[in-house]
């Protein structure tokens, strides 16, 4: 797993310290352990987890601004925990309505000592943080229009939505006349599938 992760990191053009790679592998080991009992993710094989969870999340790393970030429908902490581990400059909050997933994320925060991570258990539309977020990201939460609608109250005035998608989401964008600032095609090492990152600046809404 370590070699696969390190190779993938190089292919993504990232330069991560050894201690960050070690912490990512420790997170993956904890996820695999919990997954045997709590069924947090459908991906069971640790080698597949490297590609489908770690490298998929790491593919957006260069495109995330500094500041505060909210990961909506984070599940087991993807991409939020991965981003928090790699980017100490980010203040990351993850939120999920499923209690067992929030419990896992809290355990990961404690065991891995991720000081720049906060975990919230609850529905995003009912979440009332002390301050709005600079970036709101989702990986597999909902269609883009609903994602924006449910999180609008959480977004800073000059903030940015980042929607991680598979195929080009033209229908989602066209249905609600959303005009993204950019749609970037992402290459995930070892993954033979389309990945796109949609950039939606809050100031246009």
UniProtKB/Swiss-Prot annotation:
GO terms for cellular component: cytosol. SUPFAM superfamilies: S-adenosyl-L-methionine-dependent methyltransferases. InterPro entries: rRNA_ssu_MeTfrase_G (IPR003682), SAM-dependent_MTases_sf (IPR029063). It is an enzyme of class 2 (transferase). The keyword Transmembrane helix does not apply. Its EC number is 2.1.1.170. It is found in: Cytoplasm. One of its GO terms (molecular function) is rRNA (guanine-N7-)-methyltransferase activity. Keywords: Cytoplasm, Methyltransferase, rRNA processing, S-adenosyl-L-methionine, Transferase. S-adenosyl-L-methionine binds at residues 73, 78, 124-125, 139. It catalyses: guanosine(527) in 16S rRNA + S-adenosyl-L-methionine = N(7)-methylguanosine(527) in 16S rRNA + S-adenosyl-L-homocysteine. The keyword Ligase does not apply. Its main location: cytoplasm. Belongs to the methyltransferase superfamily. RNA methyltransferase RsmG family. Specifically methylates the N7 position of guanine in position 527 of 16S rRNA. PANTHER family: S-ADENOSYL-L-METHIONINE-DEPENDENT METHYLTRANSFERASES SUPERFAMILY PROTEIN. This is Ribosomal RNA small subunit methyltransferase G. It comes from Methylobacillus flagellatus (strain ATCC 51484 / DSM 6875 / VKM B-1610 / KT). The lineage of its organism: Bacteria, Pseudomonadati, Pseudomonadota, Betaproteobacteria, Nitrosomonadales.
